[in-house]
Each structure stands twice: as C-alpha cells, then as structure tokens.
Amino acid sequence: MNDVVIDTNVMVYCFDNKLDLKDLLDDFFQSSFSIFIIKKCMDELVVIKKQGVKNFFLSYGVNIVDFNEGKNTDDTLLDFCMDKACMLFTEDRGLRAKANKLGVKILSFDGRAVKISNK
C-alpha cells in the first residue's frame, strides 16, 4: 500500500486546474494507495479563503489526520511522513528540501502527471 500525504498547495493546484488527484495517483502507482491530509492543511484552506477546495477534497473521502498540533504545518507534515513512512506530495521547494534531507520520498507534478522528485 502506498500512503501519500498531500500539502495544501497540491490541493489548490488540483482544484484550480480541474485535476482529479485520485486519477493522477492511480495512473502513477498502478496499485492501491491512501491519501492523507493533515488537519492543519485543511485549516490553511479556510485561512486563504479556499473553502471550495476543502469541500472538494472532503468529497474524495480522504483521511483527515489531526497530528502534532503544537508544530507548524511543514514540521507536522514531515513528522507524519517520518512516523507513518508516507510519501509527501508538495510543490513547496523549501518543504521538499527539508523532506529530502530527512529521506522522505517526495512526489510533485510533472505537467499534468505525478513524478517522484527524489530517489
């Protein structure tokens, strides 16, 4: 099973570009996967006034996880990936650099497809 944690920027990108994240990940993995979203990322959508994005992803039946409430969003994402051996799907360069240093497998967009950003 492939577990993927989705960052806020990926949710907004999919919504704005009318991309179906489940279809993209299905094409990429060619096997089963689970999508996790940290509650803090969902909360960020409200702050940046992207309620439509939040509702769109809630309709996917994703796993919303309340994890490490005391830390900032990036550290929470990284901690969850390390704790659960998940891949991180993000377009945030700074977050990708931190994840790479920690050995977290990173997914990113390659046009309208998904790619592994590190090995």
Residues covered by each model-derived region:
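Nuclease catalytic cores that cleave nucleic-acid phosphodiester bonds
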Residues: 36-119
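Amphipathic, non-transmembrane alpha-helical secondary structure
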Residues: 11-12, 22, 78
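Conserved NTP-handling cores and scaffolds of large molecular machines
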Residues: 15, 29, 103-106
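A general structural motif
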Residues: 1-3, 32, 83-85
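Amphipathic coiled-coil/heptad-repeat helices and related helical stalk/stem segments
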Residues: 18-22, 73-74
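Metal-dependent nucleic-acid phosphoesterase active-site entry motif
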Residues: 1-17
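PIN/NYN-family metal-dependent endoribonuclease catalytic core
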Residues: 6, 21-49
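Short, low-complexity, intrinsically disordered N-terminal segments
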Residues: 15-20, 118
